[in-house]
């Protein structure tokens, strides 16, 4: 297959020819960084191609189950295809539906999302649904919905543009959730952070903060990025 049709990782292939959202660094970072310790039930909101869900399946053992939710029909079908074709298909389940309308009858230990941007001031992920829903939904809406499905000791992790992440952290202060982890993503050494992975919990624990730099001053992958992604990238 050509790169326009999909992306080959070490243990799985992600087809994205039918999905507006292609494989990108944001999804790879979320799938590689999300804290999987003691997580048996995981949910990926707005899964797109299913990339993050499949990465989490690779990182966890046979006792962990991963559910994924996607509204857009083409993306949903692509995610189903990718999950079925992976070596982890028996632990992956893709559902079609709107995050704000869907009903899960279980709790999750980890809920992750690389969500639409929900803002005219930020570049859209180009999903067909974004244009229709951006005016009525927000990242806070998704966070509050995720809270309903969160196990008592569970964690929610979103990857967002830096300003959107800061806004969500501020908005979350009255949500009954606590921001427990912040990972600032810096594309190149010396630049300001452009992305952030923010994690929330119902438990008020000390905030953990860290930074990840992707490229060094010579435009080479940093050692930290290599270590983080070497289980996934073919040539890492």
From Swiss-Prot:
Localization (cell): Cytoplasm
Q: Which GO terms describe its molecular function?
A: nucleic acid binding; tRNA (adenine-N6)-methyltransferase activity
CDD domains attached here? AdoMet_MTases
Reactions this protein catalyses:
adenosine(37) in tRNA1(Val) + S-adenosyl-L-methionine = N(6)-methyladenosine(37) in tRNA1(Val) + S-adenosyl-L-homocysteine + H(+)
Could you tell me the EC number(s) of this protein?
2.1.1.223
Keywords of the record: Cytoplasm, Methyltransferase, S-adenosyl-L-methionine, Transferase, tRNA processing
The entry's cellular-component GO terms read: cytoplasm
GO biological process per UniProt: methylation; tRNA processing
Q: Name one Pfam family in it.
A: MTS
Q: Which Gene3D superfamilies match?
A: Vaccinia Virus protein VP39
Q: Which HAMAP family match?
A: tRNA_methyltr_YfiC
The record's function comment reads: Specifically methylates the adenine in position 37 of tRNA(1)(Val) (anticodon cmo5UAC).
Matching entries from PANTHER family are given as: TRNA1(VAL) (ADENINE(37)-N6)-METHYLTRANSFERASE
Write out the similarity annotation. Answer: Belongs to the methyltransferase superfamily. tRNA (adenine-N(6)-)-methyltransferase family.
Q: What is this protein called?
A: tRNA1(Val) (adenine(37)-N6)-methyltransferase
């Amino acid at each position: 297959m050509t790169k326009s049709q999909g992306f080959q990782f070490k243990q799985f292939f992600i087809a994205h020819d039918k999905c507006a959202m292609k494989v990108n660094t944001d999804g790879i970072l979320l799938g590689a960084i999300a804290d999987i310790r003691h997580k048996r039930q995981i949910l990926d909101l707005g899964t797109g191609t299913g990339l993050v869900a499949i990465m989490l399946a690779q990182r966890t053992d046979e006792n962990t189950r991963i559910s994924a939710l996607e509204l857009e029909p083409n993306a949903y079908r692509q995610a189903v295809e990718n999950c079925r074709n992976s070596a982890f298909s028996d632990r992956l389940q893709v559902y079609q539906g709107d995050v704000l309308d869907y009903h899960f009858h279980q709790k999750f230990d980890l809920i992750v999302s690389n969500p639409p941007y929900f803002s005219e001031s930020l570049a859209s992920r180009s999903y067909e649904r974004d244009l229709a829903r951006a005016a009525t939904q927000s990242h806070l809406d998704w966070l509050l919905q995720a809270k309903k499905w969160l196990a008592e000791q569970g964690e929610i992790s979103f990857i967002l543009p830096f300003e959107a992440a800061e806004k969500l952290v501020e908005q979350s202060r009255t949500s009954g959730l606590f921001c427990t982890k912040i990972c600032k993503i810096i594309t190149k050494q010396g630049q300001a952070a452009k992305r952030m992975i923010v994690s929330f919990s119902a438990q008020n624990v000390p905030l953990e903060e860290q930074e990840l730099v992707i490229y060094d001053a010579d435009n080479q992958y940093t050692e930290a990025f290599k270590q983080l992604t070497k289980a996934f990238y073919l040539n890492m």
